[in-house]
Amino acid sequence: MSQNKAFSTPFILAVLCIYFSYFLHGISVITLAQNMSSLAEKFSTDNAGIAYLISGIGLGRLISILFFGVISDKFGRRAVILMAVIMYLLFFFGIPACPNLTLAYGLAVCVGIANSALDTGGYPALMECFPKASGSAVILVKAMVSFGQMFYPMLVSYMLLNNIWYGYGLIIPGILFVLITLMLLKSKFPSQLVDASVTNELPQMNSKPLVWLEGVSSVLFGVAAFSTFYVIVVWMPKYAMAFAGMSEAEALKTISYYSMGSLVCVFIFAALLKKMVRPIWANVFNSALATITAAIIYLYPSPLVCNAGAFVIGFSAAGGILQLGVSVMSEFFPKSKAKVTSIYMMMGGLANFVIPLITGYLSNIGLQYIIVLDFTFALLALITAIIVFIRYYRVFIIPENDVRFGERKFCTRLNTIKHRG
């Protein structure tokens, strides 16, 4: 596949389908949390009960992610993306009509399965469409997720203030997924192979990657990065109400600030990652910023700190470092992008399953301990990002025509080693 073909009209339709699906995925991730009060009343439960319900999303990801990685590599990207859309349709149309918590949990599992299918189809497809700019391509996924997460809290707040039935907030995304289905059926996807001429312009391996070191560190980074922003998405409104004295409508808007922050980061780094900054540098910087911010949110809770903190966490932890982690791990292990993505995201699914259970328990003890947990995850992300950063420049030789910010000394050292060898 040539780089020019990636921009032809048939592939652009496929790219639009993927990005639009991630916009709606962003909504699906926070739907249960944003409607926590309405759903708790509907199912006669409390916040911990809805946290249990949310854990079904993680279970769905956990049980399906490896399966879809194999399917994506064998049968193609479009097939698994279509499977994802079907699962999303079941969730959005099913929750409003769901009679009990048990069935709702099954629908939450469907969202997790849908996310697995979308990730193992969408990420590899985007990297295959834009092999020279895979970092920018995958980080824009986060932009679309953030658009969805910025829009949806505003919709929920509007419906809450105007006494509109919460179910309309699920039916509308369901209708949009029907439109995506029609678009997917007409779209074409690129080949799973990349031209050798393109590959030669990318960083070349100087030594064999170590699965037990950079492989494990990359996966742990993904878990920590996911958990850092996931905790904020679910629990920041409740924390802001309890410790900053904010009303429910005001507290829900913290997630809009969070999404705005992630969008700002996405567009800044989408530009920087093309030629100026390599993803591993972005991951170290952003995880350090998230660690500092989580500490401030815990130590100095106030409306200003909660709103600003949500924005900065959105910028740092949710601004695409999870997606960049996938891109970096695919560089270390490039032979099977979907399988790499599935392993990486499987651990995120494990976190998606376990973290709601832990935070649900902590919510009964004290919401402040949830923020302490968030700080711990941010710190783990920083430590593992530094490990991957160090290993990257030991494994790869940076081409002279692709030296980026801060890399000159690394590039010179590694090229010297190569010539001596």
Swiss-Prot record:
Q: Does the keyword Cell inner membrane apply?
A: yes
InterPro entries referenced in this protein's UniProt entry, alphabetically:
MFS, MFS_dom, MFS_trans_sf, MFS_Transporter
What single Pfam family name could you report for this chain, choosing any that match? MFS_1
Provide the membrane-side ranges marked Cytoplasmic in the record.
Answer: 1-9, 71-78, 122-136, 185-215, 273-279, 330-342, 391-421
Cystine bridges: none
Alphabetical keyword list: Cell inner membrane, Cell membrane, Membrane, Transmembrane, Transmembrane helix, Transport
Topology versus the membrane, per the UniProt entry?
Answer: Multi-pass membrane protein
Q: Where are the transmembrane segments?
A: 10-30, 50-70, 79-99, 101-121, 137-157, 164-184, 216-236, 252-272, 280-300, 309-329, 343-363, 370-390
Q: GO terms for CC?
A: membrane; plasma membrane
- Entry annotated with the keyword Disulfide bond: no
Which CDD domains is this protein grouped with? Answer: MFS_YdiM_like
- One Gene Ontology term of the molecular function aspect: transmembrane transporter activity
Periplasmic domain ranges by topology: 31-49, 100, 158-163, 237-251, 301-308, 364-369
Cellular compartment(s): Cell inner membrane
Q: Which family does it belong to?
A: Belongs to the major facilitator superfamily.
What name appears for this protein in its UniProt entry? Answer: Inner membrane transport protein YdiN
User: Which organism's genome codes for this protein?
Assistant: Escherichia coli (strain K12)
